[in-house]
Amino acid sequence: MANILSVRGLSFGYQGNQVLRGVDLEIPQGSIFGYLGKNGAGKSTTIKLLLGLLPIEEGEIFFRGVNLREAPLLLRSYSSSMIEHPFFYPFLTVSENLDYLDHIFRLGKGRKKEVLSLMGLNDHANKRAQSLSSGLKQRLGLAMCLFNHPEMLILDEPLNALDPQGIYELRSILKMLNQEEGVTIFLSSHILEELEKLADHVAIIHGGKVIYQGDISGLIKKQSNIVKFKIDNTSIITQLGYDSKFSLVEIHDANHVSFEIRNENEFAQLIALMSQERIAIYNITYQESALETAFIHLTE
């Protein structure tokens, strides 16, 4: 799959504070690409550089193979963005907001009807934007973004301020846009559980550097799973010589212990070792690694 956007060696600082330190990104065309990081990691700064809202100090950004140093507004010509909050005119109705865009882009009333239907806004067309729920405001913001047929959507924390129903609806809409409309979606987020359900590629930024980039399944497979069980006395565990094969995570108390294991075979071997040493075990729980576990492990 070809890359629609490539970032190479991108660095940026504010008043002596270095925010980005040689960031490299490869965003495949047609993907949903999740950009993960803690607050202050550099996600929003990266997005502002992509959109030409900040000058490129060091490094290069290529969109469709063209260096944005030579064409700084190219990405903005073929993409739409929603940064922090959806853009619309609050005192206009949903329909009037789209009429305004039609006046700019001259795509005809047919496009307005398409976007209203696509975003499920037909029943809300005559409502003032300021009266909409948070979820509907996000839909209107996306409708505004989609009006000019962008190849790519760039969204900064789009799941913020949404309730669980709103998150579910937005996730469904983004998947539909990607799968049915062919829109490449680049979004930053710290809501890892939802991003795991949505994105097919991720990059993790920490301390201004990208520390992982690839598909989610590959990231999770690199992480260990956790098995926890109860035994009669955890003091025997320290005498076992398990260290070469199994990693002890924690002795929780006199009766509970956790181990880190990489696969089901190691799980079976650990249970066999307990049996061989005549250690009775109870209440076994097996926690598979998830995106959140991997993220915490990489950024701690």
Task: Locate each region found by the language model.
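Primarily ABC-family ATPase nucleotide-binding module
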Residues: 1-3
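ABC transporter nucleotide-binding domains
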Residues: 5, 12-206, 212
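Short phosphate-engaging motifs
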Residues: 19, 108, 194, 235-237, ...
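Short, surface-exposed acidic/glycine-rich loop or hinge patches that mediate macromolecular interfaces
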Residues: 66-69, 106, 234, 262-264, ...
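ABC transporter nucleotide-binding domain
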Residues: 171-261
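C-terminal coupling/interaction segments
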Residues: 262-300
